[in-house]
């Protein structure tokens, strides 16, 4: 198993963590934008079948 030779500095550790956090933030932003476009009906990449608004009795 590979073992690092030296300890990772705090600044490098912080940089790696921020990159990891930014990837998650971007994915969440993209998912939110897609959900928003689907809910407003402005989506160009998904075809959503529209259901008739019927009251259940």
Swiss-Prot record:
Range of residues in the leader sequence: none
Broad class of the protein's primary localization: plastid
Keyword tRNA processing: no
Entry keywords, A to Z: Chloroplast, Plastid, Ribonucleoprotein, Ribosomal protein
InterPro entries (alphabetical): Ribosomal_bL32 (IPR002677), Ribosomal_bL32_plant/cyanobact (IPR044958)
Gene Ontology terms: biological process: translation
Annotated protein name in UniProt: Large ribosomal subunit protein bL32c
Homology family: Belongs to the bacterial ribosomal protein bL32 family.
Disulfide bonds: none
Listed GO CC annotations: chloroplast; large ribosomal subunit
Molecular function as annotated in GO: structural constituent of ribosome
Subcellular location: Plastid, Chloroplast
